[in-house]
Design a protein with these regions (language model features):
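Class I (Rossmann-like) S-adenosyl-L-methionine-dependent methyltransferase catalytic domain
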Residues: 1-47, 57-103, 121-128, 132, ...
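Local beta-strand N-terminus motif with an aromatic residue
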Residues: 47, 109-110
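Conserved beta-strand/loop positions that form the S-adenosyl-L-methionine
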Residues: 53
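Short alpha-helical donor nucleotide-sugar binding micro-motif in glycosyltransferases
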Residues: 106
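A conserved beta-strand element that flanks and buttresses the S-adenosyl-L-methionine
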Residues: 113
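Short catalytic micro-motifs in class I SAM-dependent methyltransferases
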Residues: 116-117
Length: 198
């Protein structure tokens, strides 16, 4: 699917369908975001500038800001950003599909997180997004990406299906754009340091 097709699907999605915990209850949804923000706080430097790309309606961005991080919430869906702003008007938002994140921010950031986003995109689209996310992060900054590897990688067929990658394909992209894989140290998501490309 194209990036625009995925964004259109999110724009039309019922709020109850955007995360499995929301189908349980709003409290479960909120707690899942708080738990992930707490886990991210063990990875990210305290108080750093962090962009939550694919922030949706703020499930992780809002509690991360509550932990003292300087959070910018970024998403390709204005519908999602409007919901976030309604819940947390003090969290700045940026409308972007990720490919132009650096231009939309107008600055480099210390870190980018992107959870449950790349899995919804084709290889080609995800590569373009990851390139855009990397371009927005200062050298030595961090990227925490929900970017799964599988023994039998497969490209998802629709916006709700999951794309998985081979480690070799990930490593080739990382080498080309300047990402160094770090020890995950108990993180469920791969962690990368922004380095000079090549």
């Amino acid at each position: 699917m194209s990036i625009d097709s995925v964004i259109d699907a999110w724009n039309q999605a019922d709020p109850a369908a955007i995360h499995p915990t929301r189908g349980i209850s709003e409290d479960a949804y909120r707690i899942s975001g708080e738990n992930q923000a707490a886990l991210l706080s063990t990875i990210l430097p305290a108080g750093c500038k962090v962009v939550d790309f694919g922030c949706g309606d703020g499930r992780v961005a809002i509690p991360l800001a509550g932990l003292g991080y300087e959070v910018t919430a970024a998403d390709g869906s204005q519908v999602m950003l409007d919901r976030l702003t309604e819940a947390a008007p003090d969290v700045p938002t940026v409308l972007t599909d990720g490919t132009d994140l650096a231009d939309q921010l107008g600055r480099k950031t210390d870190a980018v997180i992107s959870l449950a986003v790349l899995i919804h995109h084709s290889y080609e689209s995800a590569e373009r997004i990851i390139e855009g996310l990397r371009a927005a992060v200062r050298v030595n900054g961090l990227l925490v990406l929900d970017w799964p590897v599988a023994d039998e990688p497969a490209e998802g067929a629709g916006w709700i299906s999951v794309t998985t990658w081979s480690r070799d394909r990930q490593d080739e992209l990382c080498q080309r754009i300047g990402l160094k894989r770090l020890d995950q140290a108990g993180s469920p998501w791969p962690i990368f340091r922004a380095v000079k490309a090549g």
